[in-house]
Amino acid sequence: MFEDYKYLIEIYVKLLLVVKKTITEYNRVTSICKDLFLKKLVDYGSAWRILRLSSLTDQIFIKAQRIRGLQQNKTQKINESQSDEFIGIINYSVMALIQIQEGVSEIPDFNTNKCSELYDIMINNTKELMMNKNHDYGEAWRDMRVSSLTDLILQKLLRVKQIEDNSGNTIVSEGIDANYSDIINYAIFALIHMDLK
């Protein structure tokens, strides 16, 4: 009987360590992404606030296509790495989630503090989703290749484009915001695999 409890305790401790590792890695990646987001905010202000969702989707799609091209061709003429593009995917997806919540603006209307606060809210919501899915799927993403994560991002983007073309309506599928959240998580998983520092 004691051996059974000991075994269960060992499994529980291992699971806690894996969860702690995932949260640490996740926070490290999102900290790097937010740092770049805020630096660009200083340079450009919140000009992105005028972008409609379809424009953000297209920007993310271009970045995902470029990553796939780099993975297949290994030749590049622009000095930006896959990591740079994944960070861009994360930040544009956060912008999209903010636009869904706050609506599109006609002018750059957010200051740095407001953007930082909203960024944290979106990332925290997305992290909570990741933790729930990790609970159900057992961190299956750790066994996936970066190229597979790229393909999943592209698939989600094609779904988002279709939903946008349907005026945001779905019959049985999750909405645009859920797809953007998944895209963020897939990109973060890719950066964890690539050991972003």
What residue ranges belong to the model's regions?
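Intrinsically disordered, low-complexity regulatory regions
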Residues: 5-197
